[in-house]
Amino acid sequence: MTSDPTSSTAFVFAGGGSLGAIEVGMLRELVASGERPDCVVGASSGAINAAYFAGRPDADGVAMLAALWCRIRRQDIMPFSMRSLVAMLLRNRPHLVEADALRLLLERNLPYRRIEQAALPLHIVATDVLSGQEVVLSAGPVVDAVQASAAIPGVFPSVSIGGVELVDGGVANNTPISVAIALGVRRIVVLPAGFACALRVPPRSAIAHATHALTLVIARQLVRDLELYGARAQIHVVPPLCPLEVSSYDYSQCAQLIDKAAERTRAWIDAGGLAECVIPGQLREHHHAAALSH
């Protein structure tokens, strides 16, 4: 971070499952417009974007991150099978699948091994599974930190770091604006994944249903945080895609999400979005399905 925190900028990446691809489109246009953060903060799936961008914070790095998202399939993140379900039941284990696939994905693609080796100061948020308290990881093995931050309770196993069992950062603080403020940052650009506000029918699988519900909670909490911290920092929130029909469990449309988010973000920047500190209406409770059906 720069020596003068009052003039520094943080990018804050929220969680949102597969909708994390939207943040990559936002990031592409922010970087193209000349935005250069002094640090990055991320939680849950946003920790993946934060960690990758911190390692290569330029247009080429964003392009490589976009290519990664376009290659990801759900089985690369959550390799569910009847075998994994039976194993959970028979072995009485507290998670559905092992995180080997996610860990391998991170090890193959992150260009550094320790958080302190990143080109930008990186702060990853996880949750103490016993106390529910937020844990900010600013040093140590980056793969462990990201894996912990993305460890959805009940789906993935917790990750032990420093003797503390950690799970998804979204449980404690999914859009960690407060972390950036505690670091002394006074200008924050928030990249929210948003939520599927135009689903015509509820998600069919249990996991898809749960992740969609979480994105609704995330958006509501983000609005509250923006209202709470708005007087303590200059906070710019990139509007998420709206209307959006893609579930946070659907990894088949990442390329389209990236391109559409980039287009919308460019229009927002051109309209002076980075000069305003407002809460986008797209984050507030709403639904479009009824309107789209006509």
Predicted regions and their residues:
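Active-site-adjacent alpha/beta core region of enzyme catalytic domains
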Residues: 78-196, 228-279
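Short acidic, glycine/proline-enriched helix-loop-strand junctions
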Residues: 197-222, 231-236
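Short alpha-helical interface patches
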Residues: 48, 115-118, 213
